[in-house]
Regions:
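SH3-family beta-barrel domains
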Residues: 1-20, 75, 79-87
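Generic secondary-structure boundary/loop-capping signal
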Residues: 5-8, 29, 61, 69-71
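Amphipathic, hydrophobic secondary-structure cores in small proteins
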Residues: 13-66
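C-terminal structural segments of small proteins and small subunits
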Residues: 54-87
């Protein structure tokens, strides 16, 4: 079974993912880390319709530019995959 790795911007509103990696320079990686967006963190997309992407992680809402969100690779989570992982 393959792992579904996509860019954060590809998630639809209401979908969740686990951050897999960030492609970018030290500045971008540091800026995202300061907002709590690091590898292994779970994020949920709140808004993805033009303008910045709005996500939540650990109860905090974060706005991310569309270009930056394309550089964040996530593993998409679905209810079925979560159930399988728990059993």
């Amino acid at each position: 079974m393959g792992i579904d790795i996509i860019s954060l911007i590809s998630l639809h509103e209401g979908e969740e993912g686990i951050i897999h990696s960030v492609t970018g320079g030290v500045g971008l990686i540091g800026r995202l880390a300061s907002m709590g967006l690091t590898s292994g963190m779970r994020v949920k997309v709140v808004r993805n319709i033009g303008g910045p992407l709005i996500v939540t992680t650990n109860g905090t809402r974060i706005a991310i530019g569309r270009g930056q969100s394309q550089q964040i690779a996530v593993r998409r989570l679905t209810a079925a995959k979560e159930k399988a992982a728990l059993s």
